[in-house]
């Protein structure tokens, strides 16, 4: 069940369906980013909306998944195109990075979504677009 819920959550991410993501979150859902920062609802809902504005073609690709009990580990890649304040997608702002996600589920919903990834590719693009 945990891997089914985790894959549904990934589908909602790839669809940029924040409402669908929220429907799959527990009331006390926590998102943990690659720096270890923890975010909870409703801040995480605003955060996803802002992220999809910043990377309008953000995607997650799962290559392998492992599940034990209520924990799923998803291995794959994430990527997209960073869009600066001007809202223009430029090929040079495209990025992709390996990533691992850990989904902890409870009662058919995602209680914690944690990502381990190297975000330096997108940070470098952001720094370049500011200068």
Sequence positions of predicted segments:
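A solvent-exposed, acidic/Ser-Thr-rich amphipathic alpha-helical stretch
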Residues: 18-22, 26-70
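Short, solvent-exposed coil/turn segments at beta-strand boundaries
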Residues: 67-71, 103-110
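Short solvent-exposed loop/turn micro-motifs enriched in small/polar/acidic residues
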Residues: 4, 57-59, 94-97
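Short beta-strand segments enriched in hydrophobic/aromatic residues
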Residues: 25, 78-80, 117
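Low-complexity, intrinsically disordered terminal/linker segments enriched in charged
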Residues: 111-131
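Exposed beta-sheet edge and beta->alpha loop/turn motif
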Residues: 77-107
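Short, low-complexity N-terminal intrinsically disordered segments enriched in polar/charged residues
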Residues: 1-27, 129-131
């Amino acid at each position: 069940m945990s891997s089914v819920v985790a894959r549904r959550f990934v589908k909602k991410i790839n669809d940029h369906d924040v409402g669908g993501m929220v429907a799959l979150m527990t009331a006390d859902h926590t998102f943990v980013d690659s720096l270890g920062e923890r975010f909870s609802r409703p801040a995480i809902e605003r955060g996803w909306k802002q992220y999809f504005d910043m990377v309008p073609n953000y995607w997650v690709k799962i290559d392998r998944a492992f599940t034990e009990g209520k924990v799923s580990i998803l291995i794959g890649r994430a990527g997209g195109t960073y869009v600066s304040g001007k809202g223009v997608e430029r090929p040079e702002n495209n990025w992709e990075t390996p990533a691992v996600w850990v989904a902890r589920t409870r009662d058919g919903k995602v209680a914690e979504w944690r990502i381990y990834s190297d975000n330096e590719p997108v940070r470098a693009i952001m720094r370049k677009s500011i200068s």
